Design a protein with these regions (language model features):
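Helix-start/capping segments and mature chain N-termini
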Residues: 2-148
Length: 148
């Protein structure tokens, strides 16, 4: 077989089920505790980070495990330059001063949810920006209550 399975068949499975609140109803009601993970989001050129493949979730799995072990509800991963990238299983959005910010596609997994949220925000009159977010900017906004 080797690392190039040219002649192997490709099998696809699609599973669908009701999901509910990703971090639970309590998390939605009371908020969650987030740990900045020691694991980072892989660099965009390191592997196929734009594809939702099982192997690309290794860092997210390790980050979530680390957060839970340390008493947190969720993990946030930084990119390889130290900027806020994403949660272990979700995109991160900052709502500050009436503007919605999210990390650029060079640091996060592009997907339907991200596109939908950004489009809905624009449709509702929000200013939206995809740009690098420093950890200090994120922390100061959370601590002051400006970021929700």
């Amino acid at each position: 077989m080797g690392v190039f399975p040219k002649e192997n068949p490709i099998n696809v499975i699609i599973a669908v089920w009701p999901w509910g609140s990703y971090l639970g109803d309590e998390g939605m009601k009371n908020g969650i505790r987030v740990k900045i993970s020691s694991f980072s989001r892989p660099h965009i050129n390191a592997t196929m980070v734009r594809a939702k493949t099982v192997a690309n979730y290794a860092n997210s799995l390790l980050a979530k495990r680390e957060a839970l072990k340390d008493g947190y509800d969720e993990a946030a991963l930084l990119d390889t330059d130290g900027y806020v990238a994403e949660g272990s299983g979700e995109n991160i959005f900052m709502v500050r001063n009436g503007k919605i910010k999210t990390p650029p596609l060079t640091a996060i997994l592009e997907g339907i949810t991200l596109d939908s949220i950004l489009q809905l925000a624009v449709d509702r009159g929000y200013t939206v920006a995809q740009r690098k977010v420093t950890l200090e900017e994120w922390r100061s906004g959370v601590e002051s209550g400006e970021i929700v």
